[in-house]
Structures are given as C-alpha cells and as structure tokens.
C-alpha cells in the first residue's frame, strides 16, 4: 500500500457510528506508528479533509462539504436525471420519492432524491446514505446484474440483511435471475414498512450496471394498475438517463431528460 493509500485509509475510519477518532486509536486500528499517524492526520487537516476538535479528537472536515457541492453542480448524471425524476413524480398520482443511486465499491449509495411531499417520510434514505445491499428494489435490481461471485460475497458479508428474504443463497440468486429477466424490481416493505419500491437498472460504459432509479410509494395508495404503469415508466426513465449520459460522455448534446417518460405519460387535460 502506497503512502497516499495509507493517508486516505484514515478517512474510511469515520462512520456515523464513530464520527470522531484520536490519532492514538487510529494508529492502533491501522497498525501504524503514532508518529506516522500524526503525520497523516496533519496532512488531512491541512487539506481540510479532517478538522481537529478538543482533546485530540478529529472529525471529517469542511473540504468534504465543498466537494459535495461541486458534485451537485457538476455531475452530468445528476443534471440529466433530475428532470426525468420529476416526470416520474408527476406520474405517481400521490405521495412519492424518486431515488437515484450508484454502485460505489460494495455499497449502493443514494446520490439524489426528489419528493413531492417534503418531510413526510416516504423514504428513510437520502443523499450520501448507503442503502442496504440485499434488501429493497433499489439494491436488488443492481445485484441482479452483478457477477454471481460478487453477489455471493455480498450475501456472505451482509448475512444479517438476508434474514426473512430467502432461506438460502440459491433461492436468493434465483429471485435475482427473475429480476434480471423482467428488467425491473418491485419490493414491498423490505426497507421501510408500508412502502412499495419500483426500480430499474442504469447501465454505464460497456453495458455494466452503474446504478439504479427507483420510486418509493405508500403501499395503501398504490393500485396494481398504477404499479404496472410505473414499472414501464421507470424502465423508460433509466433508458433515457443512460442514453443521454452516453452522449454527454462523448461530448454530444443530449436531449432534455424525461423524453421517454413524457411519451409514456397520458396527455394532460
């Protein structure tokens, strides 16, 4: 591991469960000398990636907030997806939240959400918060397009999440195969109670799965007819996003997001 990798590995120590670290604890955790760890911490503080609190405690620094702001205004996928997500909300016919998520290492990360009912708790997840790997339409539709060995490792590493989903990995793998064939995934109450999730995969370079788009609705207000219609719309939306993203990557102009969803929606009265 290079020195740069060792410095950056310190950032992975900071989690919601443990947001503050001392240099002494970090040195023990990473198995490096205390003097080396202090040198790493000082470099991260100087760059703004860490901030020092009292009593030799460190937390994530303000530079991360600045980077997040830059991503929000410069990420081409976000720019393309936002109008598409708003069109999906228009089709929901009730309270809903649309989530754009990316595959990040071995995590599914929410990078943007749009809701038509702010603060009503339609979905418990938000930007920057990882979603469960094995549960929920958002994650399962991504897993359905990953290599079997990768899914097997995730099943092993996140076994607690699998409780109540399938009695074995083989059964879970068979369910993912059905999702892959269908092109979308529907789940009920797997992440948030009394919620229905509908998701479709977003493919990137080389037709590799890069993320997913999903809509979360209140189960009591979602008819089978609406659910069937939303499946079609979500799949159309992901194709819109993938097509426009490929054009943007090549430096070509992309048509405004939501075109496929617009075509699938009935005309306004």
Each model region followed by its residue ranges:
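N-terminal helix-turn-helix
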Residues: 1-74, 78, 239-244, 267-269
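A structural signal for short hydrophobic beta-strand segments in well-ordered beta-sheet cores
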Residues: 50-51, 100-101, 202
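Amphipathic alpha-helical effector-binding/dimerization core
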Residues: 60-157
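Short helix-to-loop capping/linker segments positioned immediately adjacent to catalytic or ligand/cofactor-binding
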Residues: 87-91, 96-99, 161-166, 182-189
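Signal-transmission/dimerization alpha-helices at domain junctions
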Residues: 144, 237-248
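Extended hydrophobic
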Residues: 164-238, 256-257, 262
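Short, highly charged C-terminal tails/helix-capping segments
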Residues: 247-269
